[in-house]
């Protein structure tokens, strides 16, 4: 999951693993800001401070891996 993330020059593969029904409004907005629209959707983002902060807001809704 998205635990112990720190900003770096790496790329992250972020996959939404749970839906947003019942999630708080700020969590829904965070997922949309990351570019995630549905369960199973994957995006690749830089591991900068902004992205890491967003991922720390929704660690229970996403799966994060380092992109190859």
Curated annotation (Swiss-Prot):
Pfam families: Ribosomal_L30. InterPro entries: Ribo_uL30_ferredoxin-like_sf, Ribosomal_uL30_bac-type, Ribosomal_uL30_CS, Ribosomal_uL30_ferredoxin-like. GO terms for cellular component: cytosolic large ribosomal subunit. Keywords: Ribonucleoprotein, Ribosomal protein. Coiled coil: none annotated. GO terms for molecular function: structural constituent of ribosome. One of its GO terms (biological process) is translation. Belongs to the universal ribosomal protein uL30 family. Part of the 50S ribosomal subunit. This is Large ribosomal subunit protein uL30. It comes from Paenarthrobacter aurescens (strain TC1). The lineage of its organism: Bacteria, Bacillati, Actinomycetota, Actinomycetes, Micrococcales. The gene is rpmD.
